[in-house]
Amino acid sequence: GFAFKTLTTQPSKVEAKRVTGIGGIFFKCKDPKKMTAWYQKHLGFNTNPYGTTFDWYEGADSTKKAQTQWTPFAETTKYFEPSKKDFMINYRVENLVTLVDALKKEAVTIVDTIETYDYGKFVHILDAEGNKIQLWEPID
């Protein structure tokens, strides 16, 4: 005879990606306009008033357009506080509200509240060494 065993499987919990790419690189310098001009002249950056924007495609299928912003800030900016570092990285994320809830449960320091603009939602957190990180859920 044949023996049959019923297999029961638990539905797999599919978690949304947290970080999908680098959304921006921000750093302090003495003269942001001069720094931007240097990068334009010597490295060919196509600059805008905020620095430059790099366009790329997210994922292997190359259908979802994404951007990374490169921006120099004045060395006197307070924008990176409470971090004492001269840089801040912006990470593109999916479902920022859900991610922030998860990070709170993981005891990650959330610096501020989620702000929404016409180009996406933003919040700042601190990493394990106190570096301020910007999380961005773009509206693509």
Regions found by a protein language model. Give the residues of each.
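Vicinal oxygen chelate
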Residues: 1-30, 49-50, 77-140
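Short linear motifs in intrinsically disordered
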Residues: 43-46, 91-92, 112-115
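Short secondary-structure boundary/capping segments
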Residues: 60-63, 78-81, 114
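A short, sequence-level motif marking secondary-structure junctions
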Residues: 72-77, 139-140
